[in-house]
């Protein structure tokens, strides 16, 4: 596995909130969240859509970015969502 293939993603949940996470394979991670095998939060509030915020990072950088995004306000996350790369299933 390439050390610089980690992505930071946002999931829009059915309650209109955003869930932030990292993965070396975001498409596979979305499938896990959708199947109820992801985070507890996405088991309760089902995913509606996912967007990639940033990619091509090593795991440490991705973790630091995730922490920073989780500290943002809902409005700031919404803006980040609007600027993020759409997943193929969303286009």
UniProtKB/Swiss-Prot annotation:
Q: Which PROSITE patterns match?
A: GIY_YIG
The residues covered by the GIY-YIG domain are 4-83
Q: Which Pfam families match?
A: GIY-YIG
Q: Which Gene3D superfamilies match?
A: GIY-YIG endonuclease (3.40.1440.10)
Q: Which InterPro entries match?
A: GIY-YIG_endonuc, GIY-YIG_endonuc_sf, UPF0213_domain
Family label: Belongs to the UPF0213 family.
Question: What protein name does the entry list?
Answer: UPF0213 protein NMA2126
- Species this chain originates from: Neisseria meningitidis serogroup A / serotype 4A (strain DSM 15465 / Z2491)
């Amino acid at each position: 596995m390439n050390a610089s293939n980690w992505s930071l993603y946002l999931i829009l949940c059915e309650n209109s909130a955003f869930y932030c996470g990292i993965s070396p394979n975001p498409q596979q991670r979305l499938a896990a969240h959708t199947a109820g095998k992801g985070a507890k939060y996405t088991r309760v509030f089902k995913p509606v859509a996912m967007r990639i915020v940033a990619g091509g990072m090593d795991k440490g950088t991705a973790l630091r970015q995730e922490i920073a995004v989780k500290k943002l306000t809902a409005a700031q996350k919404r803006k980040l969502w609007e600027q993020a790369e759409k997943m193929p299933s969303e286009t």
